Amino acid sequence: MPASFQSFSATTSRPWGRWILLVLGLLLMAALAWLKWGLDPWLRRKLEQQARTQTHGQYTLTVASLRTHLLSRSLHLGGVALRPATPTTADTLPRLTARLASLDLSGVGLLALLRGRTVPIDSLTLDSLRLDVAALARRPAPHPSRPLYQQRPLQLGYLALRHAGGRFGPATKPVGELADGTVSARDVLFTSAGATDTQRLAFAASWRALLRGPVGRLGGHTIKAQAVDFASAQQFLGIDSLHITPPAPGQGKPGAVRVLFTMPHAQLRGLRAAAWQHQGRLRADSLRLSTPHLTFWPPAQAPPPLWKLLAPVFKRADVRRVAIADGYLAVAGVDEAPAVRHLYGVATELRIDSLSQQAAARRVLYARTWVGHTGRLTATLFPPLYPTSIEHAFLNTNQQALRLTELALRPTIGPAQLNQYKGYQSTQLTAHIDEMRAEGFDFQLLSANSHVRIARVTAERPYLLARSDGRGPINHQPSIISPEAMRHLRAHLDVRRLDLRNGTIEASYRSASTPLVGTFGIAQLNATLYNVSNDPSRMSLAHPLTGTATGYLQGQCRAEVHLTTSLLDPQGRQHLRGSFGPAPFSLLNPMLKPTRLISFKSGQAQGIDFEEYVDREHIIGTVRARYSDLRINFLGYKGDEVKKTFFGRIKSGLANVVIRDQNPRPDGRVVTGDIQTPRELEFSTFTAWRQGLIVGFLHNVGIPKKLASKYGEADGGTPLPAPTDAPSRPATTADTPPRTQEPP
């Protein structure tokens, strides 16, 4: 090639190269200028436009400031607000407003972002978020898109949400509110793999949350707490100052349960939150409830079991240890008003699911064992008549032991007022037991089937005061104080042995004839019953209830009684036999003199043996009394005192001629009295026993059978006492013995 041609080519190519380099430089400078001054506005407009596009113009997104830093791969947004653009929104969109003070992204993987891969991000921090959701979407979108973690996969090293708050529901009556919250997460894998990773909780390796002032409303109840603290790495969940308040009277669903609950502290430790999310199984090492106070109004219909109520929350819950410290439990809205104070309890291996309630699970209230004690327990029996209380209760299901102390039942009205309240004669009761122990208590059977099975029950120093007023009609309904009444219990009651130790029974009676009150007592009562059961597999005529009791009548006369009966016998058959030791007949005067206007002038019993056979129709048997010098006086009542009268002296003389003054007779023959009298089902079994003894004794001393039977039967009743009637007063006679024990 000629030299002139080569020189021409070199000179013509150099200007083009310069121009290309110049253009490239200008383009680079323009790109850098656009990245510095144009990228941020473009991104801001793009975000705002994308929000309008995806919501079909129903929402407006505004971003007050947006700054990018490409070298540090960071992004900052400030003053972000999302608001509805129209008065109403489509039913496929929620109705909400959101305000965010700032959003900071750092360490964004730009290359992965451009390639459409999982974008790594070092940290994402949102500050001062306020989210108000007025309503959720009423129906799903017709063409639902893929989940966001599939559209925009991310991997965040650190995620933080600071000073968040908001409201859910209508502004006038929100369903949920949050005053302030701080949430953070580490190692967040926002991808399909992260969603299915069973070791992660909501895409993250760990979460930390502190919520202050959360408030929720459910079923008309308001639920709020001072703070909720959650840390998945430490497996911890804590709640401070939890309050649940019921709806106001007249509000809420009629017949639904109402709850009033407060608890200063609750701590759940060892919580496997990831297993809860992926398996629906709540597992934890311990749960401690500090000073929980629960008052609830039971629903009109029995609620479903606990596991079914909690099924939307978890399929199964396992907690190794549950501790309750200084709890309070009360049932309101019922006249009985039961309440438990100062409740302390520890449960082990708590499990809540459908299988744990079955009898084969051998659990007590979903737990393997319970150990605890309480303070005072109160309730009202036959409200408002009998407030009852138990001072302390001690429970150990593993040892099958229950101990109750200071059991008390106290009436609120007197015997005459009780008759007026019920409309017929009724016995007023006062009771106290120093201590009651149950050994071999099958708590698992009680929890599974509501059946009671106990090896031994012991009542220490029981005291019973029975006060009656004879003014009023007789209640002709069958008495429930009878062995055969056990047949009607729905649940099984099975006590292998029942012991009463050093008990006291006192009775007082005011007849219709005088305002004086007669008294009678049994001291040092010791009784043992075997096979107290209405379980058909335990109770039969071949295996009946048997028992023995000893005591001292009026503190003087030793008595011994043996009982045999089947609690499932439809005929109510009972066999009672016993004996009374030496005693003067005058010990009966404190009861007979003021109420029957009869007294024993003299007489000494060497011993009385009796045997009774009782069923639902008859009382039969024999009484054999050995006595001497028997004399009685018929008295009258005049001038507020019991005294001898002219007609009383005549009746006394005739009676002392008729009755046998001694037995054995002078010829050595021992006379036996027969018991033949109808059973009056409207009276208790104890009244039937007493009726048989009276009839047999009267016949034994010479009263004809028919007259003795008639005298032993109850009278037909009288009109009820008027509210202005003079109150009963104790009879003050020389025969009145001192009280064997003051009522507690």
Residues of each region from the PLM?
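Extended terminal
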Residues: 2-21, 562-566, 572, 579, ...
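Solvent-exposed beta-strand/coil patches in large extracellular/periplasmic or lumenal scaffold regions
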Residues: 145-169, 307-335, 360, 373-377, ...
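Beta-propeller and related beta-repeat scaffolds in trafficking/envelope systems
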Residues: 183-185, 196-207, 302-307, 341-355, ...
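Flexible beta-edge/linker motif
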Residues: 60-138, 145-181, 186-242, 247-298, ...
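Short, charged/polar, low-complexity loop and linker segments
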Residues: 415-417, 474-481
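Hydrophobic residues positioned within well-ordered beta-strands of beta-sheet architectures
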Residues: 101, 181, 264, 285, ...
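N-terminal type II signal-anchor transmembrane helix
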Residues: 2-56, 173-182, 344
